[in-house]
UniProtKB/Swiss-Prot annotation:
Superkingdom of this protein's organism: Bacteria
Free-text function comment from the UniProt entry: Plays a role in intracellular Ca(2+) homeostasis. Involved in modulating Ca(2+)-induced swarming motility and pyocyanine production. Plays a role in regulating virulence in a Ca(2+)-dependent manner. Involved in cell protection against oxidative stress in the presence of elevated Ca(2+).
One GO term of the biological process aspect: cellular response to hydrogen peroxide
Keywords: Cell inner membrane, Cell membrane, Membrane, Signal
Record's protein name: Calcium-regulated beta-propeller protein CarP
SUPFAM superfamilies: Thermostable phytase (3-phytase) (SSF50956)
GO cellular component: plasma membrane
Length: 321
């Protein structure tokens, strides 16, 4: 019996890469890219929350700020006389005005509720002022982003400048990450909690107890609390600003990259959102780079965007203050 050895067929590129296989490979690569992109932008988390928000709207609406009911009233109004990039926003209930900061040059700007500049106050000794928060009458906290420094300052009607060297300060070396440090502030006056937002990599919200030190008869003791579970539930790519609502005890978190304001309840669970994209909430154009959000005692939302744009959102057409 004669055995004939079979010669293996030579490898054929044309057989290995048939049009059908090439198409399948391209589809797999594209699908993988879409999944990664969706995870990066938290698309799936946001889609799932949108379903939950719709399903539980009736129940959640009664116990929350409920951002879906807000509509834009002033859109992309340039802040006249201010060409610098504004960062953060806070409402002063005593003066019934707003305050923001810029870092080049470093200064505080007081605004009317219609977005008009009332005064500017130069800052000295602040490397990268990124946020300002009202604490009590005449008392504010300013963040220095890169140094992760919190500075308590006094701001009177006749204040002409502020020097950080004269102020109470607190430095926190938590997850130092260059220009991705402390980006937003909010204050719970009843609970004496200062919320501090870390911009990204990773997104974090810290609760600081004991700063600013307001009780001279008690020792200066600072306690920092974080909530990794809450932070993971934040389906945003970054954090730009915070706002605490005394009425509900809820926290608003503003994201520039996600173009979104998220309302978090007392357990840190998202309960409602306000999209900053064109066509949403009456917006004719998307908010380009949202940097600060504040709420007044009537529930009106104010928002600033770089370079110098001013927005107002409310549930009803607000009366003139």
């Amino acid at each position: 019996m004669t055995i004939h050895a079979q010669t293996p067929e030579p490898f054929s590129m044309s057989r290995a890469f048939t049009p059908r296989r090439l198409l399948l490979a391209v589809l797999l690569v594209a699908l993988s890219a879409l999944v990664l992109l969706g995870q990066s932008f938290r698309v799936f988390d946001r889609a799932w929350f949108a379903v939950q928000e719709w399903r539980h709207a009736d129940a959640w609406k009664e116990r929350s700020i409920w951002l879906p009911d807000y509509r834009v009233r002033i859109e992309a109004q340039p802040i006249e006389g201010l060409n610098d990039d504004v960062s953060a926003l806070t409402f002063d209930p005593d003066r019934r005005t707003l305050f923001t900061v810029t870092n080049q040059p470093a200064q505080i700007i007081e605004l009317s509720l219609q977005g008009k500049v009332l005064r500017t106050i130069p800052l000295t000794g602040f490397g990268d002022a990124e946020a300002i928060e009202y604490i009590s009458r005449g008392v504010y906290v300013i963040t220095d982003e890169r140094q992760q420094r919190l500075v308590k300052v006094r701001l009177e009607d006749d204040t002409r400048f502020i020097d950080a060297a004269d102020a109470q300060q607190l430095s926190l070396g938590i997850g130092l990450n260059g220009n991705k440090g402390f980006e937003g502030l909010a204050y719970d006056a009843e609970g004496k909690r200062l919320f501090v937002a870390k911009e990204r990599d990773p997104v974090r919200i810290y609760e600081i107890h004991g700063f600013p030190h307001t009780q001279a008869d008690k020792p200066f003791a600072v306690h920092v609390v974080d909530d990794p579970g809450r932070d993971k539930r934040l389906f945003v790519r970054d954090l730009s600003s915070l706002q605490f609502d005394e009425g509900t005890g809820h926290l608003l978190a503003l994201s520039d990259e996600s173009r979104l304001v998220v309302e978090l309840d007392t357990d840190g669970e998202p309960v409602s959102t306000l999209s900053l994209l064109r066509g949403m909430h009456g917006l004719k154009r998307s908010v380009p780079q949202a940097e600060g959000v504040a709420m007044d005692d009537r529930g009106v939302l104010y928002l600033v965007s770089e370079p110098n744009l001013f927005y107002v959102f409310s549930k009803d057409e607000p009366a003139q203050p």
